[in-house]
Amino acid sequence: MSEANLNRTLSGKVVSDKMNKTITVLVERKVKHPLYGKIMVRSKKYHVHDEANEFHTGDVVVIEECRPLSKTKAWRVVKLMQKAEQVS
């Protein structure tokens, strides 16, 4: 069994790029309330490894799980889905 197929992937929006080689990605998911059936938005922030400091706030990225890189960082960026809009 190959380990490459076992890594989980998520997509989310970069909300912070102030750390060196680390970005914070906000991942949102929709869940149905078990009793009332209302669709709710749940979110979680992940610290993600960005080796070249190439991703910035507002970018939409795909991340995948990897070995622990620090106390709070166990995800890395796979690819850029959408670049943030530049406001001039």
Curated annotation (Swiss-Prot):
Family classification: Belongs to the universal ribosomal protein uS17 family.
GO MF annotation terms: rRNA binding; structural constituent of ribosome
Gene from which this protein is expressed: rpsQ
Keyword terms: Ribonucleoprotein, Ribosomal protein, RNA-binding, rRNA-binding
Alphabetical list of InterPro entries matching this protein: NA-bd_OB-fold, Ribosomal_uS17, Ribosomal_uS17_bact/chlr, Ribosomal_uS17_CS
Domain of life where this protein originates: Bacteria
Coiled coil: none
Organism: Nitrosospira multiformis (strain ATCC 25196 / NCIMB 11849 / C 71)
Protein's UniProt name: Small ribosomal subunit protein uS17
One Pfam family matching this protein: Ribosomal_S17
Function as written in the Swiss-Prot or TrEMBL entry: One of the primary rRNA binding proteins, it binds specifically to the 5'-end of 16S ribosomal RNA.
One GO cellular component term noted in the UniProt record for this chain: cytosolic small ribosomal subunit
Subunit structure: Part of the 30S ribosomal subunit.
